[in-house]
UniProtKB/Swiss-Prot annotation:
Keywords: Aminoacyl-tRNA synthetase, ATP-binding, Cytoplasm, Ligase, Nucleotide-binding, Protein biosynthesis. It is an enzyme of class 6 (ligase). Its EC number is 6.1.1.17. GO terms for biological process: glutamyl-tRNA aminoacylation. It catalyses: tRNA(Glu) + L-glutamate + ATP = L-glutamyl-tRNA(Glu) + AMP + diphosphate. ATP binds at residue 246. This is Glutamate--tRNA ligase. A motif ('HIGH' region) lies at residues 9-19. NCBIfam families: gltX_bact, PRK05710.1-4. Monomer. Catalyzes the attachment of glutamate to tRNA(Glu) in a two-step reaction: glutamate is first activated by ATP to form Glu-AMP and then transferred to the acceptor end of tRNA(Glu).
Amino acid sequence: MSVCVRIAPSPTGNLHIGTARTAVFNWLYARRHGGRFILRIEDTDRDRSLPRYTRNILAGLAWLGLDWDEGPVYQSKRIERYQAVVQQLLDRGLAYRCYVSEAELEEMRAAQKAAGKAPRYDNRHRFLTEAQRRAYEAEGRQPVIRFKIEEPLEVSWVDLIRGPITWNTQDLGGDMVIARADGCPLYNLAVVVDDIDMGITHVIRGEDHIGNTPKQILLYRALGHEPPQFAHSPLILNPEGKKLSKRDGATSVAEFQQLGFLPEALKNYLALLSWSPPDGEELFSLEKAAALFDFDRVNRAAARFDWDKLNWINSQYIKRLSPPELVERLTPFWQAAGFDLSEVPDPTWLEDVARLIADGIDRLAEAPPLSRFLFQEPLSYTLPALEQLRLPGVAEAMAAMATTLAAAELPQVSADSLKPLVDQVAKGQNMKKGLLMKSLRAALTGDLQGPDLLESFALLQRRGWALGRLEAVQKLVPC
């Protein structure tokens, strides 16, 4: 059997991180077995489905590198196909028109709740006569279409993650609506028809869909098809074990992209949410994971989103990038911060900046604040930096550093060539090396913390800004 799986997001919102994890699992399983990975857009909700969400979903999957083999297939373009199946079920007596109003349904649910029963449709219109149907239509009622669910009946399947599962049809809420009054199909019917037509062999999705599975199995059987195999992955919760929400930070793939996570790092982390490779490795490409992916190693327990671990994984991927690659990734973030990248002193300067800050960032979005002093002139100072520069003897030491730097004939500006000059000034000013270095950082970067000082000094000198910043200290010190 040739494996065929699908990811089927609904464009009623941006691509959610949970949907992305489901896409990763489907992609891994398809690649592991040499199968097909189909993208389907479930856009039958006319009120909530929006083109901008569709664009966001497609862009998010593409950014993650989850290439699909077929699609995108849009449900909105298959309405006639669904309506034909609904008519087939009506003709065979497996479905019927239901004229119960929303007010009557609410009254029914209220009575059931008052009696301590679970709310359900009581199938009251399953056996309407033709005269009764005409009477309801004369009132102007528009019927929905309900699929007949036999009760009592046990529906069982062996979930590839959770093992054997059995549902009694008495717990399914009565005959289910499969089409609205306007003819638009509902979720359970549309996905079953699609999965049949697309030859889906494995449905891999979140555990929140377990309750839909028995209904869909009944529809498969009614349409004369064997159901596919099902695998329901655990939900992703926040660190406190509650449903992941916007209060916990980013929840959409686009937000993670804006925060500066690399797609390869985010894919790596998503694969580790509920799954682990046999060798226990935590850093791997999705291609390597595909060779190892198996449902036996998917944990049934809910996964907790761990920001610290994601940040660590991302930092490791950043460190693996070559300087030119890192510059390419950082450029949009620098540009968004308003940095002018066209006026750099030499072709390798940006690469050296990237090399300097690579160890100090977990996310690309952290780069602009860390490297701002290298791109913006005049320099702005933090209050602690100003206090440092106003300490006794510091202004004189900065003036001496400026004089020494101006007189030096450096064959090549580097941290190694600047170090002797710093040592010379420390000795000449009778100043402890630590105090001088701290003061130099304040003068050159406007802060007391940051990347390697001598490397920063060299980059500023190559740009022609170091001398001016040392001389500017005199203006910061009260007379």
